[in-house]
Amino acid sequence: MNKRVKDVVDAIVAAVQRVLDQKEVTEAEYRTAVHYLMQVAEQRETALLCDVFFNSTVAATKARISEGSTPAIEGPYYRDDAPLVDDRLKTYDTDDHKPLLIQGTVKAVDGSVVEDVTIDVWHSTPDGKYSGFHDDIPTDFYRGKLRVGTDGSFRVRTTMPVPYQIPDQGPTGALLETMGGHSWRPAHVHFKVKAPGYETLTTQYYFEGGDWITDDCCNGVQSSLITPDIVEEGVRLMNINFVIEPARAQAGANP
């Protein structure tokens, strides 16, 4: 028996049972919910539904016990096969969005330089889509892997991402609408920072003053993840100093 699985599932079941009782959910409402979950599965939106309502809580829990930079939701558009890049992500020739320079450092909790660090960077196209997932956009556009310098520094040029709507034509979008919500995410850039012997940091950073920054449909925005509105010579700057922590044992790793 996996005690960790039992403890978590028992707690989830107890919480749902408590809400069913407190809200006096009827048999008809219960059956509607069961049918809804079947629709979610049939339309392959299980991951989307869970990400919208629960992923930010998992990220916030990790942030609470972490000594490193603030983690955030990964989202569904990460690809491990992104190409290595030197100083620029590949973008459309027709992309006339404001240039963006992402730069900063990666350090350990004690401030020391970490060896052999790579950073995955990915963000939306100017029309709110992701390479390798939408419209046959080549997988090497708007994403790449950076090798961090021996001094812990990195920099890469790209263009500004845009706010976009998560898929909202299926049951997840219908539920958000029924609840009076919406399906918009603020513009952001994703990062995954990896180094041998260290916890992988998965996070995303946002832009001060951006649309939907205070009303993200996925509740993913934390104040520590919002970068200030700094523009130099027509280039928006995103300055980030990542802090990563030593790897630790994972709860429930052994059955």
Curated annotation (Swiss-Prot):
Pathway: Aromatic compound metabolism; 3-chlorocatechol degradation. Its cofactor is Fe(3+). It comes from the Bacteria. GO terms for molecular function: catechol 1,2-dioxygenase activity; ferric iron binding. Its EC number is 1.13.11.-. Pfam families: Dioxygenase_C (PF00775), Dioxygenase_N (PF04444). Coiled coil: none annotated. GO terms for biological process: catabolic process; catechol-containing compound metabolic process. CDD domains: 1_2-CCD. It is an enzyme of class 1 (oxidoreductase). Binds 1 Fe(3+) ion per subunit. It catalyses: 3,5-dichlorocatechol + O2 = (2E,4E)-2,4-dichloromuconate + 2 H(+). Keywords: Aromatic hydrocarbons catabolism, Dioxygenase, Iron, Metal-binding, Oxidoreductase, Plasmid. Belongs to the intradiol ring-cleavage dioxygenase family. Preferentially converts 3,5-dichlorocatechol as opposed to other chlorinated catechols. Retains diminished activity toward non-chlorinated substrates. This is Chlorocatechol 1,2-dioxygenase. It comes from Cupriavidus pinatubonensis (strain JMP 134 / LMG 1197). The lineage of its organism: Bacteria, Pseudomonadati, Pseudomonadota, Betaproteobacteria, Burkholderiales.
